[in-house]
Amino acid sequence: MPKVAIYNVSGQQVSEIELSENVFGVEVNEHAMYEVVKNQLANRRQGTQSAKTRAEVRGGGRKPWKQKGTGRARVGSIRSPLWVGGGIVFAPKPRDYSYTIPKKVRRLALKSALTSKVNSNELIVLDELKLDAPKTKEMVNILKNLNVDKKALIVMGEKSEAVIKSANNIQGVQTALVNTINVYDILKYDKLIITKDAVQKVEEVYA
């Protein structure tokens, strides 16, 4: 079982925790992570793009000039895609980009993402993370104590408005509840800061 240190908000190691081999010690499957990230990004697309074909552009029903005898190129409509103001060839239309992938693949991808953070020493476990009131300065100091100077995702076991509001004002820092974590966010941020109770909940669900 992978073993990592547990820190307090002052950056001091207070104990150690043995992580579940089935969650934080699996063989990293990069293809599964790729498929899930691609799926997440596709599902986020609005798909509202739209343009008109030559049949949908208003006007252009009359032939601009006669077919022969003018010396000019033959034209059937001023709404031809070749003309300014004409229709669009294969014009994009609103569509739904979302699709589903097997639950087994999603679980494997999440475990792979968590394991990759452990393998690259980018996982920080906190004994607890509590703030009496929203204070950005206090959150900045906590990150400084943990030597976090890059993008970080903070995962909590229980919702804390004080923590969320304190982190919202810090560029490159995002908070998430343990039941909302996903592969894209885990890989997007350089550091994964997770509370001890959140680790236990992750292992309960995915072990």
Curated annotation (Swiss-Prot):
GO terms for molecular function: rRNA binding; structural constituent of ribosome. Residues 44-71 are annotated as: Disordered. Keywords: Ribonucleoprotein, Ribosomal protein, RNA-binding, rRNA-binding. GO terms for biological process: translation. HAMAP family: Ribosomal_uL4_B. InterPro entries: Ribosomal_uL4, Ribosomal_uL4-like, Ribosomal_uL4_dom_sf. Residues 60-71 have a biased composition (Basic residues). This is Large ribosomal subunit protein uL4. One of the primary rRNA binding proteins, this protein initially binds near the 5'-end of the 23S rRNA. It is important during the early stages of 50S assembly. It makes multiple contacts with different domains of the 23S rRNA in the assembled 50S subunit and ribosome. Forms part of the polypeptide exit tunnel. It holds the Pfam family Ribosomal_L4. Part of the 50S ribosomal subunit. One of its GO terms (cellular component) is ribonucleoprotein complex. Belongs to the universal ribosomal protein uL4 family.
